[in-house]
Design a protein with these regions (language model features):
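Acidic/polar-rich alpha-helix caps and helix-coil junctions
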Residues: 1-4, 58-314
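Polar, glycine-rich mid-to-C-terminal structural blocks
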Residues: 1-53
Length: 314
């Protein structure tokens, strides 16, 4: 098949997300990046332990396994990206504070151009996977946030997803449905169906399923009826990549020399120390322009309406 064909046995998503041999035309939004950065790890889980060369534990992972396997962050020194630490291998310039790892060949190449033939990737396109099914099941158990009777079951399945990535679990460890009470950390929060639904909508589904499936996030927002609301909320959130005290992220490169990455880390905007010129804001145009009647669904193709003159007849 032609490289550009939609029916080829390969895809080109790696070219869109990668800064190394790719076009980096798809970059994680600021709010999503910050949500990944702020995920709380389970400090009881040995997968989050960091050891020195002597085998001695010296601390914990800075970012969750879910974050590290979804996006590349310049200061994620416990993960690799195209053969090296992210801050060594990737440029992180032009306000590029993160890159999607999903769909890229970061684990087998040092550059996407290493593929043969080039611009072709054999990574499967994830239409749906078990985590999505678990999260939809949890949503059903609380009936979209209206029924508390299914809370325990919903939490059980959300926590199965979180446990896979060694993230702090939700709910109370004393709950009858707490499967990992002895070996995992729970946040000990008492949830209602509504508060758990909000967590599903704004944290769990977007972080677990980012850029997967066929427009999963777009369809989720549409079926919940909150697309415009979400755009408006996110357009009010401010972030910045301004280096603290003007100090860049510094690491040691492949050649043993010092490497500096300026403006490569994302922070929450603080008006007391940051200027308006330093702010990064998501979805400003979308918040102003989105119209549900016009944009929620694609129009029926002209070819279909021409071929079927009775399409709109009632």
């Amino acid at each position: 098949y032609d490289t550009w064909s939609d029916v080829a046995l390969h895809n080109m998503l790696h070219m869109s997300v990668s800064p190394l041999g790719g076009w980096r035309t798809i970059i994680p939004s600021a709010w999503l990046t910050m949500a990944y950065k702020e995920e709380r790890i389970d400090t009881k889980d040995s997968r989050n332990f960091v050891f020195n060369g002597k085998g001695e534990m010296v601390g914990f992972r800075k970012y969750s396994l879910r974050a590290s396997n979804s996006i590349a962050l310049v200061d994620d020194e416990e993960s690799t990206y195209y053969g090296y630490r992210p801050g060594v291998s990737a440029p992180f310039n032009n306000k590029e504070y993160a890159y999607f790892k999903k769909y890229s060949n970061w684990d087998i190449y040092e550059n996407e151009n290493d593929a043969s033939p080039q611009q072709r990737s054999g990574i499967n396109y994830r239409v749906i996977r078990l985590a999505d099914v678990y999260l939809m099941y949890a949503e059903c158990m609380i009936k979209g946030g209206t029924d508390d009777t299914g809370l325990s079951e919903a939490l059980k399945y959300i926590n199965r997803v979180r446990r896979r990535s060694a993230i702090e679990l939700l709910g109370q460890s004393t709950d009858l449905g707490a499967e990992y009470a002895r070996e995992a950390t729970y946040n000990e929060t008492i949830y209602t169906a509504q508060s758990l639904m909000e967590h599903l909508m704004y944290i769990e589904r977007p972080l677990e399923l980012s850029i997967e499936g066929h427009a999963i996030r777009q369809i989720d927002l549409r079926r919940w009826g909150i697309t415009k609301q979400r755009f408006q909320y996110l357009s009010q959130q401010k972030f910045t990549n301004a280096d603290p005290q003007g100090t860049p992220y510094t690491t040691i490169g492949k050649d043993g020399k010092e490497v500096k990455r300026w403006g490569a880390r994302l922070y929450r905007f603080n008006s007391t120390i940051h200027t308006e010129a330093q702010k990064i804001v998501d979805y400003e145009q979308a918040a102003g322009n989105y119209n549900e009647k016009m944009h929620a669904y694609y129009p029926i193709p002209n070819g279909e309406t021409m071929a079927n003159p009775n399409l709109y007849n009632k």
